[in-house]
């Protein structure tokens, strides 16, 4: 992903498609520059103000970096160890966590350190690698969010068709395809990324495109492929999902009241909570099927369990309607969490996409408007996308919170508590009635009927 780089203390060789800093047509890499905060001459800005801004930037970078590393590592460990969380949706969330971790590890240090040191000291290989890995990470995150939206749409609106292909093996193939496609899409970054001297003992990692037209075409291409088209696809998918869930909840509510009145009139008994019939809701069909987890995500069950579930389907009743409604509510919670993830992702990346496109078509105007604190905030906001997902999971995913607690308990088991010994002048504890009953039952069962 291409980010603007602005440098206050260095003047580039002149304008052009690969020119540096405050000149028109600059196209620079994710702020891993010798940049400070503004294109103004250093003497105009007070030393105290610059030191304060630098301290704030370092603090924010450190917080975002630590939260990204810790949070995404936690997601990877929890989703890897918890068998109950091995759903198709969580497979894509695992890939999303890996891409966010890659963004934090491969890009953040090489963004902050050159800003502190005033020059890029890591060489051409690191320069090209950082540019490439950042683009791959952003592309993988976007494609994973699109895959999650389509998977949720299929699971909720087309459940019968979805169960044919909605397996973890198919999800693994889709995830592999997203990584390969992202890797191919971002090949121009290492090709056109160079380390260029821009002053005495000052090096800068930057993109040097063949012409301004190529740079404009590339910016528009990324804007369409990684922002507008995915945004439209996800908006349509989640809109249809929300409509289906609303109609499903209303349908089950009406069915529940009708079934209860019918059972009361006929003197029937409530049924179980097994799979129910398919019903039509606004063009989307919903079915409650075996193998669906409580969070509304499909899990793979052995074939024997599926066959046994089919053979032992209980009679429909009020309990079945309530179970269907509970499953719909669980799906609604999952979709709400996924919507928050999508909104936060686009909120974090919309400013940098807009800034890159603006700079590609109007370099001087973009630099005048964005130099200083605005571009620093835009850079930090784009990196913050790597640490928001763990927070969303912890606050909105009850099962993920429980899995985190279980993982921590497994890694740090508590020592067994020693029973307090009775004092010499105390009587031994008297067994309770329940203990005596269990003892008598065990004795009788062991000895047999006389």
Swiss-Prot record:
A lipid is attached at residue 411 (S-palmitoyl cysteine). It is found in: Cell membrane. It comes from Mastomys natalensis (African soft-furred rat). Residues 80-87, 151-170, 243-336, 398-450 are cytoplasmic. This is Gastrin/cholecystokinin type B receptor. The chain crosses the membrane at residues 58-79, 88-109, 132-150, 171-189, 220-242, 337-358, 377-397. Disulfide bonds join 127-205. Residues 258-277 are annotated as: Disordered. Receptor for gastrin and cholecystokinin. The CCK-B receptors occur throughout the central nervous system where they modulate anxiety, analgesia, arousal, and neuroleptic activity. This receptor mediates its action by association with G proteins that activate a phosphatidylinositol-calcium second messenger system. The gene is CCKBR. One of its GO terms (biological process) is positive regulation of cytosolic calcium ion concentration. Glycans are attached at residues 7, 30, 36. SUPFAM superfamilies: Family A G protein-coupled receptor-like (SSF81321). It is a multi-pass membrane protein.
């Amino acid at each position: 992903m291409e980010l603007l780089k602005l440098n206050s203390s260095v003047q580039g060789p002149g304008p052009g498609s690969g020119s540096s800093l405050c000149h028109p047509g600059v196209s620079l890499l994710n702020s891993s520059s010798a940049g400070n905060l503004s294109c103004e001459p250093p003497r105009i800005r007070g030393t105290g103000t610059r030191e304060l801004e630098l301290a704030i930037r370092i603090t924010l970078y450190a917080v975002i970096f630590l939260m990204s590393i810790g949070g995404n590592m936690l997601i990877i460990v929890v989703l890897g160890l918890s068998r109950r969380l091995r759903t198709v949706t969580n497979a894509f969330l695992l890939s999303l966590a890996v891409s966010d971790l890659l963004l934090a590890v491969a890009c953040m240090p090489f963004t902050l350190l050159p800003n502190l040191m005033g020059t890029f000291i890591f060489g051409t290989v690191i320069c090209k690698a950082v540019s490439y890995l950042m683009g791959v990470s952003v592309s993988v995150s976007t494609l994973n969010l699109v895959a999650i939206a389509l998977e949720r749409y299929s699971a909720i609106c087309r459940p019968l068709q979805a169960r044919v292909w909605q397996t973890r093996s198919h999800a693994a193939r889709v995830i592999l395809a997203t990584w390969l496609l992202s890797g191919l899409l971002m090949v121009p970054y290492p090709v056109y990324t160079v380390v260029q001297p821009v002053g005495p003992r000052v090096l800068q990692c930057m993109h040097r495109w063949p012409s301004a037209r190529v740079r404009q075409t590339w910016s528009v291409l990324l804007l369409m492929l990684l922002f507008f088209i995915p945004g439209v696809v996800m908006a349509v998918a989640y809109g249809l999902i929300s409509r289906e869930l609303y109609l499903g909840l209303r349908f089950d509510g009406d069915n529940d009241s009708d079934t209860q009145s019918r059972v009361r009139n006929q003197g029937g008994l409530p049924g179980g909570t097994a799979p129910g019939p398919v019903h039509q809701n606004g063009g989307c069909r919903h079915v409650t099927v075996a193998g669906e987890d409580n969070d509304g995500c499909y899990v793979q069950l052995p074939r024997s369990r599926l066959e046994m579930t089919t053979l032992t389907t209980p009679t429909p009743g009020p309990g079945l309607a309530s179970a269907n409604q509970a499953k719909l509510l669980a799906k609604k919670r999952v979709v709400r969490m996924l919507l928050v993830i999508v909104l936060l992702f686009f909120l974090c990346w919309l400013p940098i996409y807009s800034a890159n496109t603006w700079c590609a078509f109007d370099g001087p105007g973009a630099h005048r408007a964005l130099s200083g604190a605005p571009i620093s905030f835009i850079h930090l906001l784009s990196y913050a996308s790597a640490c928001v997902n763990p927070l969303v999971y912890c606050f909105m995913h009850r099962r993920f919170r429980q899995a985190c607690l279980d993982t921590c308990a497994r890694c740090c088991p508590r020592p067994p508590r020693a029973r307090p010994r009775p004092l010499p002048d105390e009587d031994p504890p008297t067994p309770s009635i329940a203990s005596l009953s269990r003892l008598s039952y065990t004795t009788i069962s062991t000895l047999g009927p006389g």
